[in-house]
Amino acid sequence: SGNPVAMAAGITTIDLICKKNFHINLEKKTKKLMVGLKNAANKYNIDLQINYSGGMFGFFFTKNKKVKNFKDVSNCNQILFEKFFKLMLKKGIYFAPSSYEAGFLSIKHSDKDINYTINCAENVFKSLKEN
């Protein structure tokens, strides 16, 4: 609509994402989070598959090696996803509430944020395995 505040925000956003290595750094952060979640799940023998690109990601509780489409997601353990989601939420970590939805990481998520999330996930996986 040409609102000056919206235009200024848009220009600033474009300036930020045009900075050298912006997308490379964003993907590195996402990879760190996804690999951390995968390793934490593996530690407790929980089947977790991950998909990610740039700052967008998804993870799925399944033994299948690839999750590529709606049918694949439908065959995942939705009950385990819901339990994981709720336990992570209690720890202050908000993921997308369904494995049918994508999650997003931003360039502003710090290594401290990512490490905290991975540590919380490891505790949740341990709890899920014990129960």
Feature-to-residue mapping (PLM):
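Conserved N-terminal phosphate-binding loop of PLP-dependent enzymes in the Aspartate aminotransferase
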Residues: 1-131
